[in-house]
Curated annotation (Swiss-Prot):
The gene is ribH1. SUPFAM superfamilies: Lumazine synthase. It comes from Rhodopseudomonas palustris (strain ATCC BAA-98 / CGA009). InterPro entries: LS, LS/RS, LS/RS_sf. The keyword DNA repair does not apply. Its EC number is 2.5.1.78. Belongs to the DMRL synthase family. HAMAP family: Lumazine_synth. GO terms for molecular function: 6,7-dimethyl-8-ribityllumazine synthase activity. One of its GO terms (cellular component) is cytosol. PANTHER family: 6,7-DIMETHYL-8-RIBITYLLUMAZINE SYNTHASE (PTHR21058:SF0), 6,7-DIMETHYL-8-RIBITYLLUMAZINE SYNTHASE DMRL SYNTHASE LUMAZINE SYNTHASE (PTHR21058). This is 6,7-dimethyl-8-ribityllumazine synthase 1. Catalyzes the formation of 6,7-dimethyl-8-ribityllumazine by condensation of 5-amino-6-(D-ribitylamino)uracil with 3,4-dihydroxy-2-butanone 4-phosphate. This is the penultimate step in the biosynthesis of riboflavin.
Length: 163
């Protein structure tokens, strides 16, 4: 049986030339490199361009996305979509829950409030092994998944704008 998570979406609304922001948390450099590689490959395949903004950790990603959206709009070069990339590994305290839940909530709030296409590629895992399995482009490729999600939402936005 085909993996339903990988089934191509039928909407092929053109997203070539889209300007996409990637905000990445560089807390785990090697894992982040893999997430970024997967996301960039998907954007290139779709003909989208991208800028990368780096922040210290996952909690800083939502604010950085909001700041960048505002700055780009003010400069007359608005972003069409954004991708959040990072990794949160469970430790011995509740910090994991706070970071994973609050970053996801803030990204969702931002996307809904601004009607802005956003793919969340902040992986939340129990172990380094789980992180690698999710980050590698040849494996679960969560960076690529986040890019596909952002582009899918952009396609919906563009298609409905024409209706």
């Amino acid at each position: 049986m085909a993996d339903a998570r990988r089934a191509p979406l039928k909407d092929q609304t053109d997203v070539s030339g889209a300007r996409v922001l990637i905000v990445e948390a560089r807390f785990y450099d090697d894992i982040q490199d893999a997430l970024l590689e997967g996301a960039v490959a998907e954007l290139k395949a779709a003909g989208a361009t991208h800028d990368v903004l780096t922040v210290p950790g996952a909690l800083e990603i939502p604010a950085a996305v909001a700041i960048a959206i505002d700055s780009a709009e003010a400069a007359g070069k608005p972003y069409d979509a954004a991708i959040a990339l990072g990794c949160v590994v469970r430790g011995e305290t509740i910090h994991f829950e706070i970071v994973s839940m609050e970053s996801a909530r803030a990204l969702m709030d931002l996307s809904v409030a601004r009607k802005f296409p956003l793919g969340n590629g902040i992986i939340t895992v129990n172990t380094d092994e789980q992180a690698w399995a999710r980050a590698k482009p040849g494996d679960l490729n969560k960076g690529g998944d986040a890019a596909r999600a952002a582009l899918a939402m952009l396609r919906i936005k563009r298609r409905l704008a024409k209706a």
